[in-house]
Amino acid sequence: MKTILVAGGAGYIGSHMVAMLVKRGYEVVVADNLRTGHWQAVKGARKLYVGDLRDAAFLDRLFTENKIDGVINFAAFSLVGESVTDPLKYYGNNVEGAVSLLNAMKAHGVDKIVFSSTAATYGEPEKQPIEECDRTEPTNPYGATKLAIENMLKWCDGAYGIRYAALRYFNAAGSDTEAGIGEDHNPESHLIPLVMKTALGQRGHIGIFGEDYPTPDGTCVRDYIHVKDLAEAHLLALEYLDRGGKSDVFNLGLSLIHISEPTRRRG
């Protein structure tokens, strides 16, 4: 039975990844600092290590105590607005954490990593749909940190033979009702939970930035992927690498709906 390390496995997407891996018969080890994640969301993992990826001793202990066959990395700060006001926080956490993780992988002979990246690496796209070969020019530090990690992964493949699959996507949505996990951000920043809370009377109103886009209501088009589909894509990427697949970058996700429509149907 293979053992997979899920970095950031107590977060929204990471916890769904853990649940899916366990269901598919993998042993799972989780590393999370619990700054935005929740230990209660980690279901079925062999062990949850609470600590900072930038702590080399913490990672050395984790890799020494567990024979890790592959890594899936979700660990990152991800608020675009905050990244603009505090870019050093994002470079310090996201990039330095990834450097430390790759150093531990190299030291312990682990040669496969699935990196949860972002479509924010593209910035303002010149055309749609976006293709993996399109220009990458992030417009915020969050996207820039993810692109920096992608570039670092490319060089680590060439230098150390650590193969990677980087997955670029926009917005995750949904939950795994069977596993009893879902979105739990504090403060909540994702649009769909905010819309649902407004519909339930838990908020007075919802504000959406943008009013001059070429859409029926003037707001921008958002691309969504269900969180279980997203976890499935990360698992497929892991299996691709396990079969000897070459390092690459992949785009994920498409859902062209008005956010208000499913909310009305649920109501």
Report the location of each language-model feature.
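Generic structural signal for alpha-helix termini and adjacent loop/cap motifs
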Residues: 16, 37, 86, 104, ...
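Glycine/proline-rich active-site loop of Rossmann-fold NAD(P)-dependent oxidoreductases
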Residues: 147, 160-162, 174-193, 201-204, ...
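Glycine-rich beta-alpha junction loops
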Residues: 170-173, 212, 256
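Structural/interface elements that position substrates and couple domains in central-metabolism enzymes
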Residues: 119, 225, 253-256
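Single conserved hydrophobic/aromatic residue that forms the stacking wall/gate
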Residues: 257-267
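N-terminal Rossmann-like NAD(P)+-binding domain of SDR-like oxidoreductases, especially those catalyzing
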Residues: 1-175
